[in-house]
Amino acid sequence: MEYRYKNIYLGETIEEIFSELNNSNTEYKRSTFVLLYRPYENIEVYIYLEFGKVRLMKIFDENFQIDNTLKVGIALTDEIVNRYDLYYDDFEEVYLSKKHKELVVIVDLADNIIGFSFHLELVGDEAFATDRIKNYLECKNLQDIYGSLYWSKTLDANIEKREIYGQLDNYKFTFDIITRDIKSIQNLETGEFVKISLNK
């Protein structure tokens, strides 16, 4: 099964999609550290900045279909449930698939299909905000100190400048939004730059 809507696909990197992002179609969601990209009226694309990839897509386009039997606007029948090995998730109030882990079927109260989600589950260490190094002043990439930055609740992003920001103690960290590599570390008390990347 292909997890794609027009030219956007699940797992696509921010580098591949970045030229399409702008302030009118993309919004930074601080609480989840994602860019919410709306390239078309009936789709939401979630770019997880920690990984730099599309990890969630929500599609509500009335003309969208995965194949001839699974499409928006039709009733969810027993045949479809069995074919895709679907089961109802009471917490999320959607149908998940045992056969296609990335597929979510969204239905209304009458069990008519109103949309789909494609998602990549977080596995292993991805599911937890952790650090890879102890001394955050030695970080080379956002993932090195992501846990500390996440828990500090200081993460921010700027699409126009192509940067991700975070603060620990009195240090401001600036990362490239595409590679997530460190661009600079600034001591906010002195204004001095502790580290500036060669790529800046």
Predicted segments, located by residue:
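Acidic/histidine-rich, surface-exposed loop or edge segments in extracytoplasmic proteins
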Residues: M1, M57-D61
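Short, recurring structural edge motifs at helix starts
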Residues: E2-N7, F64-T69
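A cross-family detector of function-defining hotspots
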Residues: E12-L56, K71-K200
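Short glycine-rich, polar/acidic loop-and-turn segments at beta strand-coil junctions
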Residues: F51, D61-N63
